[in-house]
């Protein structure tokens, strides 16, 4: 809804971070964003893997990577004291961008020389028909056999946009342990993993995102996450056993040791 309203809106100004964050990345000097963005009309928005791409006039983009929270606020709303970028529109509404752990706020004209962004543009989306069983098989064939299931799915952006957050339910639905090595997978398990990638991400998207995340207006998504920091203390919804939380490959993993045995 906000995106449709903003089609006729023009950026009035942009303001640099009130709270500098060493793990917030920009394209060039963020002090130059004002000259690049001011006066540009908002045209559209699109999602590519882990990126949200805001398209303005004159081929100007604002590409936001995973980890950047974007919130649309109407005219008169209070401006938060801490942010990494703020953009105001000519109707006095504004967009505020914040980063908790890490993220990129990239304002640029024409193209962005970033391998993850370019990969997200060029690789098939798991939500699309181009991401089929044959394509998935090629990804598996190109991966080192000693990679774990988590490393295969959620590192190096083999599958654009698939990160640690959505990984948990994908592996649970496939009944695969996050530490299990790809070399141990049989055909049936690879089929289950492919099916879980497609169906789980489609369900999350159709429901407006996970309930552990918030949308442009601050509302949580409608997809009820099975495995997360909010649910791991609950019993497994399938077998009733205890769930496990572990630190693994730079983030937490959640799994059921009974339903997802380590083979």
List each model region and its residues.
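Phosphate/anion-contacting hairpin/loop surfaces
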Residues: 62-162, 166-173
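Short glycine/proline-enriched turns and hinge-like loops at secondary-structure junctions
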Residues: 56-57, 78, 248-249
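Generic recognition of long tandem-repeat/solenoid scaffolds
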Residues: 52-56, 87-88, 254
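Basic, nucleic-acid-binding surfaces and adjacent catalytic neighborhoods in DNA/RNA-processing proteins
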Residues: 14-33, 38, 43-46, 51, ...
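A common structural microfeature
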Residues: 6, 42, 49-51, 61, ...
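Glycine-rich, N-terminal phosphate-binding loop and its surrounding beta-alpha-beta segment
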Residues: 47-55, 60, 66-68
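Single conserved hydrophobic/aromatic residue that forms the stacking wall/gate
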Residues: 1-7, 11
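Acidic/polar residues in short coil/turn loops that connect beta-strands
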Residues: 58, 89-91, 250
